């Protein structure tokens, strides 16, 4: 999911 990538940033 995109949520994981957003949290990484």
Swiss-Prot record:
Is the keyword Secreted assigned to this protein?
yes
Q: GO CC terms for this protein?
A: extracellular region
* Entry keyword Secreted: yes
**Tissue expression, per UniProt?**
Expressed by the venom gland.
* Keywords carried by this UniProt record: Secreted
Q: Where in the cell is it found?
A: Secreted
Role summary: In vivo, causes moderate edema formation and moderate pain, when injected in mice hind paws.
Record-given protein name: Cryptide TyPep-15
Species of the source: Tityus serrulatus
């Amino acid at each position: 999911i995109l949520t994981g990538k957003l949290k990484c940033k």
